[in-house]
Amino acid sequence: MEKLWGGRFQGKSEAWIDDFGASISFDQKMAKEDLAGSLAHVAMLSKCGIIPASEAAEITAGLKILQEKLALGELEFSTVNEDIHLNIEKLLHEEIGPVAGKLHTARSRNDQVATDMHLYLKQAVAEIIQSLKHLRVVLVQKAEANVETIMPGYTHLQHAQPISFAHHLLAYFGMFTRDLERLEESVKRIDISPLGSAALAGTTFPIDRAYSAELLGFSAVYENSLDGVSDRDFIIEFLSNSSILMMHLSRFCEELILWTSHEFQFVELTDAFSTGSSIMPQKKNPDMAELIRGKTGRVYGNLFGMLTVLKGLPLAYNKDLQEDKEGMFDTLETVQTCLDIFAGMIETMKINTEIMEESTQKDFSNATELADYLAKKGVPFREAHEIVGKLVLECTQNGIYLQDVALSHYQEINPLIDDDIYVVLSSKTAVQKRNSYGGTGFDQIKVALENAKKTL
C-alpha cells in the first residue's frame, strides 16, 4: 500500500519494519480528538479562504461520517498507515476521494499530534479531578462520623500520642486537596492550542490560529511554533502530579494493609475489596490496597521514562516523541481506576472503634500528657521529660502503664501531682485537650470539618 508521504522514496517498506514504527495500536485512543482537530482545521481553512467553501463542506461531511463510524466502532485501522493521523486521512480519502488531500493544507502531523494530546489530556484530567473531588467528599463524611473515635497516632510506626481518627483522615484530606490544586492549576498549561504551528516554523498560508483554537475550546495558542510542536512539559507535569497523588494513595493503602491485619484489626474492608487464598481458606487479603500500592511504582516509571525520553532531544520533533503517549495513557487509566477503587474502600470500610481506642490504653502514648501536666505545674519541661522517661522505664520493668501507677507513688516522684492526673492520662482527655489550631482536639476537628466542607 502506498504511503501518504512516499513521494521521495523508491524502495518498498517491509511489514515488520512498518510494525516497529507504527503507533496506531495505541494512538487510536485519540481518534475522537484527531477528528475534532481536523474539523476545526478545515473550518479555519475555509474561513481564511485557503480552500473553497464547497471543498471544505465535502471534507467536513466526510469527517462527520467518520465520527459516526467511530462511535459505532466501525473504523478499521492499519499499521501500514502508521498512526491515527494517516489512518484518518486514508479513511477520509476512501469516503470522499482526492479532495481529502486538501485537509492537510497548512498542517503537519507535528502540530496535529500535539493538538490531539492536548485535547485528550484536558478531558481526561477533568475526569480525574472529578474523581478526586468525590474522594475528598468521602473522606469528610468518614471523618465526620469519627470525630470522637480515638486511635494511636504514630511516629516511627510506634505509638506516639492518641489522636482522633477524623484527624488522621483529615490529614489525607489536606494531601488530596493539594493534589487537586496541582491538577486544576496545570489545566491552564494543557489548555493551549499548538494547531497551526505546522512542522516547526509556522506556515506561509494566511491561517487564523485563534479561530481553530476557539472552535476546539482552547483558551490560548502557543506563541512560538517551535515550542508548540516540541513541548511535552504539560505531559510531564501531569505525570509528576499523578506520581504525587499516587504516593498519597499508596501511603494510605499501606496503613489500611496494616490496620486490616490480625495484629491491628482497626478496620475491616468489605468483601468486594478483598480476595482469598487458593490454599488457606481463612484468608481475607487487602488485595485492592496492595495493588494501588504496587501501581504507584508503575506511575513513577512512566514519569521517569518520559523525562528520560526528553532529556537529550534537540528541537523540534523527533521520532522519540512517539514514546510520549503510552505512559500518558497508562497513567491516566491507572490513576482514574485507583481513585475510584480507593474511594470505594474508604466509603465502605468498617471501623473497629473499640479496638482502636483500647490500643491507646495499653501503651505509653499518654506520656506527653504527664510531662505537660508537670510543666503546667511549673516544672521545666526538660526536667519533666526526664522524670516521665524514668517512670516509663520503671513501668515497663513492672509490666504496668502510667494510668496504673498509684497516686502515692506519683506524689513520691513529685508532690505537685494530684488525683486529677488520671483524668489527664485518659486517651479521650489527651485528644480532647489538644485544641491548638490544627490540632486533634474535638473542637478543632469540627472547625476543620466546616472549613473542609466549604472547599468541596
UniProtKB/Swiss-Prot annotation:
Cellular component, GO, one term: cytosol
Catalysed reaction equations from the record: 2-(N(omega)-L-arginino)succinate = fumarate + L-arginine
Biological processes per GO annotation: arginine biosynthetic process via ornithine; L-arginine biosynthetic process
This enzyme's EC code(s): 4.3.2.1
Ribonucleoprotein is among the record's keywords: no
Associated pathway: Amino-acid biosynthesis; L-arginine biosynthesis; L-arginine from L-ornithine and carbamoyl phosphate: step 3/3
Entry keywords, A to Z: Amino-acid biosynthesis, Arginine biosynthesis, Cytoplasm, Lyase
Class in the EC hierarchy, top level: lyase
Protein family membership: Belongs to the lyase 1 family. Argininosuccinate lyase subfamily.
The protein's name in its UniProt record: Argininosuccinate lyase
Gene: argH
